[in-house]
């Protein structure tokens, strides 16, 4: 059975919850059309620990597709990231209390990698399912961008560059939105069930496209 590796992140910063973690946990073990199975895992919000965990997952699971997810509090809808860039630069401490400035992720590696997910097919599937979504041209320079770049680099370096791989940012859920202090601007949010549904539809679109490509090579 081919595997889609699905990751989410633990809660971080001031957020009491991470909707990407909930979606990943809810979809673990899901059987998708075409005989695909979902293997979910949670990543720590610390770049080096997340990179080590992701390397282990990629090596052990040997996935046929990779869908990384994380929270982008403030975005009103689900968004697919087009590119991962090879630098860390953030002032919000990670969960190890660290910040980084202009720090290369992989010295002497490409400055950026384009995601290899079927972005337009996912957008079309969302639209058919009445889920608003879009493509983003910046995953930021925090841990979300780190794991996107790390996964794409690892796959390329290990001869797996054709494996569909990319990142999906989800908006806040109600728990995250309700944790915002009353004197701060409110966050847009979606019910957790809708966030999970968007991740599931994306996974189905990825594996459907991959199955078609595999059949074309037979």
From Swiss-Prot:
PROSITE patterns (alphabetical): PYRASE_CYS (PS01334), PYRASE_GLU (PS01333)
BP GO annotations: proteolysis
SUPFAM superfamilies linked: Pyrrolidone carboxyl peptidase (pyroglutamate aminopeptidase)
Catalytic activity: Release of an N-terminal pyroglutamyl group from a polypeptide, the second amino acid generally not being Pro
Entry GO CC: cytosol
EC number: 3.4.19.3
Main location: cytoplasm
Catalytic residues of the enzyme: 81, 144, 169
EC category: hydrolase
Function according to Swiss-Prot or TrEMBL: Removes 5-oxoproline from various penultimate amino acid residues except L-proline.
Cross-referenced HAMAP family: Pyrrolid_peptidase (MF_00417)
Family membership: Belongs to the peptidase C15 family.
Protein name from the UniProt record: Pyrrolidone-carboxylate peptidase
Underlying gene: pcp
């Amino acid at each position: 059975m081919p595997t889609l590796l699905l990751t989410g992140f633990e809660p971080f910063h001031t957020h009491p919850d991470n909707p990407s973690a909930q979606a990943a946990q809810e979809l673990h073990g899901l059987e998708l059309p075409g005989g695909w199975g979902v293997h979910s895992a949670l990543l720590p919000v610390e770049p080096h620990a997340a990179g080590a965990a992701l390397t282990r997952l990629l090596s052990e699971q040997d996935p046929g597709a990779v869908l990384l997810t994380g929270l982008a509090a403030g975005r009103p809808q689900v968004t697919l990231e087009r590119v991962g860039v090879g630098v860390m630069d953030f002032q919000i401490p990670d969960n190890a209390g660290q910040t980084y400035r202009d720090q290369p992720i992989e010295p002497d590696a490409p400055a950026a990698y384009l995601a290899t997910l079927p972005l337009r097919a996912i957008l079309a599937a969302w639209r058919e399912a009445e889920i608003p979504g879009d493509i983003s041209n910046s995953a930021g320079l925090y841990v979300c961008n780190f794991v996107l770049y790390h996964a794409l680099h690892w796959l390329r370096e290990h001869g797996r560059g054709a494996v569909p791989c990319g990142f999906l940012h989800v908006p806040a859920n109600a728990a995250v939105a309700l944790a915002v202090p009353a004197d701060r601007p409110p966050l847009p949010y979606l019910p957790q069930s809708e966030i999970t549904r968007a991740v599931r539809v994306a996974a189905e679109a990825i594996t459907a496209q991959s199955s078609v490509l595999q059949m074309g090579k037979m």
